Amino acid sequence: DFYKSVVNPETAWLYGCGACNASLLGIGERTGNTPLEAMVVQAAQLCGMDPKVNYPAITEIAEYFRNGIGHDITSNMPLVGRDFNTTRAGIHADGLLKCEEIYSCFDTQKLLDRPVAVAITDKSGAAGIKHWIDINYGENVPKDDARLLAIRDKVDAEYEVDRTTAISDPEMHKWYAEAFEQK
């Protein structure tokens, strides 16, 4: 109940306990339920990945809860939240482009079938936009590409008129099409 629902059973494992009680997404009749998905990842961190475990099922379970039964998962919830592995800072996006291991807690693509994501804001800069394009279009464009800079100018213009929210993916797709698919 005091944010110890993962560290307590993990510590118990280290001292010889063979199991812990847990529930999917930590959902239960009270607060402080241990999320099963967290313990699966903790076990992998402690003992190494088990080839018999389907780790991407964690993402599939979250998608089922979100889309199948309409359960609202907090966007920043570890492992399953929509934005748990999303950066908004251009310097981090640039770091991800150079060496993802430094800026990501683990290989989220390998473990959860979820790539590290970038949300575009006034802090993203050309590096954040480049990473977004790489993820969404598989196009390796340089940060000084005129088309990319045209998108950055549109992002900057949004925040110059006091925008406070991230640029949405539909907006980015539209701006990408305008900049990259011009005839």
Predicted regions and their residues:
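Catalytic cores of alpha/beta
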Residues: 3-15
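Conserved, mostly hydrophobic/aromatic
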Residues: 16, 39, 133
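A mid-to-C-terminal "edge-of-domain" accessory segment
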Residues: 51-183
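Active-site beta-loop-alpha junctions enriched in small/polar residues
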Residues: 1-5, 24-25
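Secondary-structure transition/capping motifs at alpha-helix termini
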Residues: 13-20, 46-50
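Catalytic-loop motifs flanking and including active-site residues across diverse enzymes
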Residues: 8, 32-38, 125, 129
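C-terminal helical cap(s) of enzyme catalytic domains, especially alpha/beta-barrels
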Residues: 28-54, 58
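Glycine-rich phosphate-binding active-site loops on the catalytic face of alpha/beta enzymes
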Residues: 15-32
